[in-house]
A protein has these predicted regions:
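Sec-dependent signal peptide recognition
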Residues: 2-9
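N-terminal export/targeting and maturation segments
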Residues: 20-67
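N-terminal glycine/threonine-rich, aromatic-flanked beta-hairpin/loop signature
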Residues: 47-102
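Beta-sheet ligand-binding and adhesion/scaffold domains
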Residues: 89-153
Length: 153
């Protein structure tokens, strides 16, 4: 009986040792952005079919809207001031925009590797319209009033 137990233990041990650890795909690590100055971002208003190029300078930026993805017909242009706070271990990078008409947006920069556009990893900024205290503004139906999504490679 002891011999049978030893034999079973030997077979079980041999089987465990022969199991291979599955290969893990290497994780993609992308650098955090320390700044968004002098960068070009893209956005699309799918409801109104407007394609945007958003250019960030040192402290101001410009958002240009086009009627198609080929950027042939410019239909809008507006300027904004912005602040950018780089990410820390505890907090995502923060982005705040204030347009010339006083409309404000606030949100976060999501690191590359979490979203893809055309099968490419992209940095992603998610902004919501906010009041002067930084609180998200909701419409009469309790839905977020306005948001902007933008990305860059």
């Amino acid at each position: 009986m002891k011999l049978l137990k030893y034999l079973i233990c030997f077979v079980a041990s041999t089987m465990l040792l022969s199991c291979e650890k599955p290969e893990e795909s290497p994780s993609k690590t992308y650098p955090a952005l320390e700044s968004i100055s002098n960068t070009l971002w893209y956005s699309v208003d799918t409801k109104n079919q407007i394609y945007y190029d958003i250019t960030y300078g040192e402290t101001t930026g410009e958002m240009v809207g086009y009627s198609n993805s080929l950027r042939e017909d410019e239909i809008s242009r507006c300027n904004f001031a912005y602040t950018f706070t780089p990410a820390t271990d505890e907090v995502d990078a923060l982005v705040n925009l204030t347009f010339e008409d006083g409309v404000r947006y606030g949100g976060i920069l999501i690191p590359k590797g979490n979203f893809q556009v055309n099968n490419e990893d992209v940095y992603w900024i998610q902004l919501y319209e906010v009041d002067d205290k930084g609180n998200i503004i909701y419409d009469d139906n309790g839905k977020i009033k306005s948001s902007i999504l933008m990305w860059r490679e």
